[in-house]
Amino acid sequence: MEAAAMAVTAATGALAPVLVKLAALLDDGECNLLEGSRSDAEFIRSELEAVHSLLTPNILGRMGDDDAACKDGLIAEVRELSYDLDDAVDDFLELNFEQRRSASPFGELKARVEERVSNRFSDWKLPAASLPPSSVHRRAGLPPPDAGLVGMHKRKEELIELLEQGSSDASRWRKRKPHVPLRIMGGEMQKIVFKIPMVDDKSRTKAMSLVASTVGVHSVAIAGDLRDQVVVVGDGIDSINLVSALRKKVGPAMFLEVSQVKEDVKEITAMLAPVKSICEFHEVKTICILGLPGGGKTTIARVLYHALGTQFQCRVFASISPSSSPSPNLTETLADIFAQAQLGVTDTLSTPYGGSGTGRALQQHLIDNISAFLLNKKYLIVIDDIWHWEEWEVIRKSIPKNDLGGRIIMTTRLNSIAEKCHTDDNDVFVYEVGDLDNNDAWSLSWGIATKSGAGNRIGTGEDNSCYDIVNMCYGMPLALIWLSSALVGEIEELGGAEVKKCRDLRHIEDGILDIPSLQPLAESLCLGYNHLPLYLRTLLLYCSAYHWSNRIERGRLVRRWIAEGFVSEEKEAEGYFGELINRGWITQHGDNNSYNYYEIHPVMLAFLRCKSKEYNFLTCLGLGSDTSTSASSPRLIRRLSLQGGYPVDCLSSMSMDVSHTCSLVVLGDVARPKGIPFYMFKRLRVLDLEDNKDIQDSHLQGICEQLSLRVRYLGLKGTRIRKLPQEMRKLKHLEILYVGSTRISELPQEIGELKHLRILDVRNTDITELPLQIRELQHLHTLDVRNTPISELPPQVGKLQNLKIMCVRSTGVRELPKEIGELNHLQTLDVRNTRVRELPWQAGQISQSLRVLAGDSGDGVRLPEGVCEALINGIPGATRAKCREVLSIAIIDRFGPPLVGIFKVPGSHMRIPKMIKDHFRVLSCLDIRLCHKLEDDDQKFLAEMPNLQTLVLRFEALPRQPITINGTGFQMLESFRVDSRVPRIAFHEDAMPNLKLLEFKFYAGPASNDAIGITNLKSLQKVVFRCSPWYKSDAPGISATIDVVKKEAEEHPNRPITLLINAGYKEISTESHGSSENIAGSSGIDTEPAQAQHDNLPAVRDDYKGKGILLDGRCPTCGRATKIEEETQDRVADIEIQTETTS
């Protein structure tokens, strides 16, 4: 709450941060404020601090409906004043010494504070929270059964089947499909017929080519007596987008027919089928209906309530009143449940308030009565609109579980509640209400228009605005109904001109809060909006900058929030983004195995745009915007979003004042005969031009010269710039620089002069190296160079003492500088899809919060624990320089990415190096390659290492005699891995008493039936065999060893022992239960995941090639096997990086 209280908000503007800035100005003795100006500033600070202390607990602390407070005239004045004061402080700081001595920056603001704030706040009271209409609180009764229930039949049948028959879907969650879902249902495919005036074969060819290239189209043909019809057959066709494309590219197109055709789609249906449980059919006792506001949750719940009502002894339909905290009317809700449950069951209703006491006692009395009454009855309980988990917990306690077939249906718009239900109760099935498909949406919208008699005036082809309504509503039933009704009201004004039509439709969008016929839709959206705390409302309102056709890039939006001052830390902002997803305002598409993207429903965006306009928070101008209204607005434009198609010349030709605009976001290519007039934006702090193809090098130079003094965020991702100009050094206050996906090939030396830079993102560029001047960026906490040709990081990165995130993913980097160990605040190091297999041992000094992402996995590798201090204190300074040559931290090895990094001794050795024995006894893990045997004194040293938990022994040549492990030492060891042609090892009684994991990596060699002795490993739980991809698991030496371990596993006292056996790509898990039938035969084993092929290869060490270095006991002749695999790894890594870059 404290962080939120100091942030910029939609209600109080920049009040909190500007007070901090003003205090710093007054405390700075070098600012040369004149006495009069100092007095003005102190007065302003004193008055506004009093206002802030009054507003903070009353507005920021409330989570209810404080919308009236945010729109209050006095609070609006304070909000605007805070922005102007922020500008005034920055204006003063830009002046030179002489100019400051004669300036009077705060005189006018002081007068405003006296006149408009001080005298009015003495008797000001927070406006009373306005309550939503009672119809919103309690939605009793059903809507009239008419054509408005389009698309509900399929949902009803699916839900009835779940309640009556249960589900074989092991996930217990029916996910909402993205908009325009696949149309494969019951083996049917779509047949769509369009009518298009096509005058010649050229236009027909153009139409057929366009249709044939559309996703989901299986066949296309020309039909009709005049050859003016296009017949399309396919599945998952976005018919609305297709007809729009035909109208633009060929001519006015219109639907003639949409129907289903029978096809054999068994193969496709199998691909789309949900994951089934093997032998179970789960009973569903509770259904949680999850969906967006206006998505039809309540409607389908009511339909079910009436359709199934006669099958139950008693039934209840109760709605929860939305509130900022668990409902104060929950006792009333329980009483309502009790009263409804008794209807038709008993002649005389019990008094729900029959118990004595109030508050919790009365609530508990009702819970007990409801539970006792329902215990022996078959019931149907519908609870509509759960807003708080605490509410559901209380209600759930009152509903007893019995075996009489009782069913519970609940609805919610909050993902977090649905997920918790799903996690806490195995009897719950989550049913996400999806969008109406385009055909049903079209039928609903067109039906409303024709029923009103306006259908013949809407027009056909490109003039039919129902197409645009359907496109904008994304299948949301409530929006389709009310927007179509509003369209009927506007129909007389619609004309054929595209721009005029867009303007009229934009008027409908922008009128969600004002047009009377849209009030039911507005009320539904207001419920969710008023449920948000103020800081989330601010972040959500900022999303109104997007057009509904834009996808939201999470990182881009989160960092703009930071630049705007809404949030201070990226981790905090990421959490807020996730909260907006959980509350249903932002929708995530994709999963953990695919690209994720985010979007906000178009109707919700329209609502947010209206709210943003009310607060003068953000002005959005796009195709169809009424520029005259924007120009005549009495309030200054604080934040501006220009969307594709907007004629930016209007900014110059109109009287629109953008001199106080602090944020400019340009989405897409705007209509620009002369370009964006950046000279008009005198106080810009955030400039986002990402993906704007009109921005080139010359524009960037002008931007740096005109906007140099205040810009904190500069987004140039996806533009056509090729070079960052030297004028970049003028951006003295720049904090975030995005130049990814551009054509730049180098960073200028002047980058070092951006002293306040916090985030530098150059991903997907042609940059080959980082300049040495990067060491000057002492405030940098994020450095992202992924997908660039960079092959080496300069040692100067070690000077970036505040760096928290470093991403070198998919680059040519193969080794990190030792200076990385000096980055004490580093939290995330991403080296996935690089040649980096090891970190310098100095990285062990970094905070234990560091997460290393390696290989091709999102799982983090933690650094070894508990040795940093011992390493630092136990090694003399003169010796530390040599440590890098004898020790590193392996983050990927032949066994794949470990969960914890392993200290590794590079190269091959005859014996364990003396430096390891002298200085590194404290290690918790060790990985070493020996030539062909483990000497007795070396084994004794390993056995006596006090902290050793993980040990990896690799043998260059096959040991002549088995290595014997007796019952002495290795008291802490939990994981032991052996890498050898054939594992020649034997465990004696009481060996390695705490060992849980035994892992072998082997190739081929002479077969041996010698016992390994795993029965002597008393704590053993798992044995893993990893066979080299160059050999098969049925090779004699390999299969013989596996057979020995199988037999011993059957005799182990800890049965079952898990055996994992693979041969290169796909892993198969088997458990020994005393029968060899449970263990996969070696000849039938598949291979391990492809990603592991290159991950499991050894690291490349250039340090020792051609340098003649021979460390303690190192063998110079036993490196052939290692060299072969190193060269193979290089080839694999080359292919991998090229693939990543081109994709």
Swiss-Prot record:
HMA domain ranges (all copies): 189-258
Alphabetical keyword list: ATP-binding, Coiled coil, Leucine-rich repeat, Nucleotide-binding, Plant defense, Repeat
Molecular-function annotations in GO: ADP binding; ATP binding; metal ion binding
Record InterPro entries: Disease_R_plants (IPR044974), HMA_dom (IPR006121), Leu-rich_rpt_typical-subtyp (IPR003591), LRR_dom_sf (IPR032675), LRR_R13L4/SHOC2-like (IPR055414), NB-ARC (IPR002182), P-loop_NTPase (IPR027417), Rx_N (IPR041118)
Pfam families: LRR_14, NB-ARC, Rx_N, WH_DRP
Residue span(s) of domain NB-ARC: 282-570
Protein induction: By M.oryzae pathogen infection.
PANTHER family reported in the protein's UniProt record: DISEASE RESISTANCE PROTEIN RP, OS08G0412100 PROTEIN
Family of this protein: Belongs to the disease resistance NB-LRR family.
Its biological purpose: Disease resistance (R) protein that specifically recognizes the AVR-Pik effector avirulence protein from M.oryzae. Resistance proteins guard the plant against pathogens that contain an appropriate avirulence protein via an indirect interaction with this avirulence protein. That triggers a defense system including the hypersensitive response, which restricts the pathogen growth. Contribution of Pikm-2 is required to recognize the effector avirulence protein AVR-Pik.
Subunit field text: Interacts with AVR-Pik through its N-terminal part containing the HMA-like domain.
The protein, known as: Disease resistance protein Pikm1-TS
Organism for this UniProt entry: Oryza sativa subsp. japonica
